[in-house]
């Protein structure tokens, strides 16, 4: 009797507990759905942080960047999306591989250059690098006094003479020519003559020393300083000699530029041809541009010219010829245009260049396919902003993968093919207004001197196509396209070719 009653009580309790648990589960589910919905509608969470790849302790994603960060960042973006939050030691940059949406009228108030980089000593720009009134005045001087179309045209004789020397060297060669080396020498000579009034070549002790300093300077600009990302590991830069190299090259470059300025000030009548240093010293002495500049500012501007105008120009020529040798049908089409425009004339003029539409398409396609500086100069958010639906808090470093943007399938048809024809009926240009093609950057921080390198690039390539037929060496039927890390991405193996005089 008691056992039956006890069993009935247990069964009733079991039913109550079951109903209670079911009720609790139902309430919990309703609460979970409500909380999730509330969180998704919460203003705080509407704009979340960008997705992040998995990271290591302390180092974060540093090792994942590898020696060619533009490739690895694009691979990560394929998994995590076009905008990512990285963890590079203590630095948390946002990386983007897709062209930005909308206009950038307010970019000045949103972004600035990062401060505190150890390699900043190389650029001698600590006093003038920040965005402010003085920086704007210096940029105005560069645009108006140094890099205007009129000024670029004034250096036409320099381009013509140095290009003629290059054509002679190629013509005098009986076999393979090292185009990589020749393009580097050409651009160094053009930039040196334009910037400081003379060139520094082999056989000149001072010239060889300067070229050595310049090579190491450009190499260090592309190096990664572990102390910039993990401040607690600053001592590694001391042990591996990085800090020592930075200080030595900064000192040697400063001494060289100071010597150039001193010679010009002591003997201004000795200048052989117009150059940037003399123009800047005229402003320095007479305040002729309405702004006061000091010697450090002159050095910083000239150093910027060397950094932006030597390696990058040579790299674009190197990759342009690489692709033309890989695609003989494109080369024949370009040669046909150049020779048809020039006809029987020996010298190519600027008017001729303006008529060479396929030449300009080849240059654009080269800079899309082989963006010379694949990762643009990083910027830092000056305030909280929203980018593509994600929150980017103040102080975040922003990295733009211009190389990946140039190969974005949402912007380009067959982006992995070298096809200059895509630009023949297109208004897309590289001057910073079309965000799917930004080899020189965009907005107020874009490179103001695009006219200067383009004049050299187009003139040189047109002459190479007019005066020679080109083929690969007989022992090299297929080109190795491997890239060498650095600020400007060069070929690992120098480009060799055979040029036959026309």
Swiss-Prot record:
Keyword annotations from UniProtKB, A to Z: Heme, Iron, Membrane, Metal-binding, Monooxygenase, Oxidoreductase, Transmembrane, Transmembrane helix
Main EC class the enzyme belongs to: oxidoreductase
Main location: membrane
Cofactor(s) it depends on: heme
EC number: 1.14.-.-
InterPro entries: Cyt_P450, Cyt_P450_CS, Cyt_P450_E_grp-I, Cyt_P450_sf
Protein's cellular compartments: Membrane
Region described as Disordered: spans on this chain: 93-119
Pfam families, sorted: p450
Membrane topology category: Single-pass membrane protein
Family: Belongs to the cytochrome P450 family.
Name of the featured protein: Cytochrome P450 71A8
Lineage start: Eukaryota, Viridiplantae, Streptophyta, Embryophyta, Tracheophyta
Encoding gene (name): CYP71A8
């Amino acid at each position: 009797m008691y056992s039956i009653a006890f069993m009935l009580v247990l069964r009733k309790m079991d039913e109550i507990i079951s109903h209670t648990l079911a009720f609790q589960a139902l309430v919990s589910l309703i609460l979970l759905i409500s909380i999730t919905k509330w969180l998704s509608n919460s203003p705080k969470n509407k704009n979340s942080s960008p997705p992040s790849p998995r990271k290591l302790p302390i180092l974060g994603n540093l090792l994942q960047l590898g020696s060619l960060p533009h490739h690895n960042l694009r691979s990560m973006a394929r998994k995590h999306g076009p905008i990512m939050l990285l963890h590079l030691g203590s630095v948390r940059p946002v990386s983007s591989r897709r062209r930005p949406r909308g206009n950038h009228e307010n970019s000045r108030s949103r972004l600035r250059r990062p401060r505190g980089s150890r390699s900043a000593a190389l650029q001698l720009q600590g006093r003038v690098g920040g965005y402010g009134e003085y920086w704007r005045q210096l940029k105005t001087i560069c645009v108006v006094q140094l890099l205007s179309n009129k000024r670029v045209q004034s250096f036409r004789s320099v381009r013509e003479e140095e290009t003629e020397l290059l054509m002679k060297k190629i013509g005098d060669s009986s076999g393979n020519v090292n185009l990589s080396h020749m393009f580097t020498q050409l651009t160094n000579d053009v930039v040196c003559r334009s910037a400081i009034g003379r060139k520094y070549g082999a056989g000149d002790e001072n010239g060889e020393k300067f070229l050595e300093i310049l090579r190491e300077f450009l190499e260090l600009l592309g190096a990664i300083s572990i102390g910039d990302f993990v401040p607690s590991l600053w001592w590694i830069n001391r042990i591996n000699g990085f800090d020592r190299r930075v200080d030595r090259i900064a000192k040697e470059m400063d001494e060289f530029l100071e010597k150039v300025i001193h010679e010009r000030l002591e003997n201004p009548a000795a200048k052989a041809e117009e150059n940037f240093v003399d123009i800047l010293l005229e402003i320095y002495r007479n305040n002729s541009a309405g702004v006061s500049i000091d010697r450090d500012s002159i050095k910083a501007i000239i150093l910027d010219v060397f950094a932006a105008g030597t390696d990058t120009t040579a790299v674009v020529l190197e990759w342009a010829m690489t692709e033309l040798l890989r695609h003989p049908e494109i080369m024949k089409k370009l040669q046909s245009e150049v020779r048809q425009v020039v006809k029987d004339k020996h010298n190519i003029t600027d008017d001729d260049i303006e008529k060479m539409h396929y030449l300009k398409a080849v240059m654009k396609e080269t800079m899309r396919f082989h963006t010379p500086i694949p990762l643009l100069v990083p910027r830092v958010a000056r305030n909280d902003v929203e980018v593509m639906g994600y929150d980017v808090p103040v102080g975040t470093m922003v990295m733009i993968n211009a190389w990946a943007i140039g190969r974005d399938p949402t912007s380009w048809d067959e982006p992995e093919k070298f096809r200059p024809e895509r630009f023949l009926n297109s208004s897309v240009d590289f001057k910073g207004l079309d965000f799917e093609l930004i080899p020189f950057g965009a907005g107020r921080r874009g490179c103001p001197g695009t006219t200067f390198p383009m004049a050299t690039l187009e003139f040189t390539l047109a002459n190479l196509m007019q005066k020679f037929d080109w083929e690969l060496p007989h022992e090299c039927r297929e080109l190795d396209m491997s890239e060498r890390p650095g600020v400007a991405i060069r070929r690992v193996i120098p480009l060799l070719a055979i040029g036959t005089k026309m």
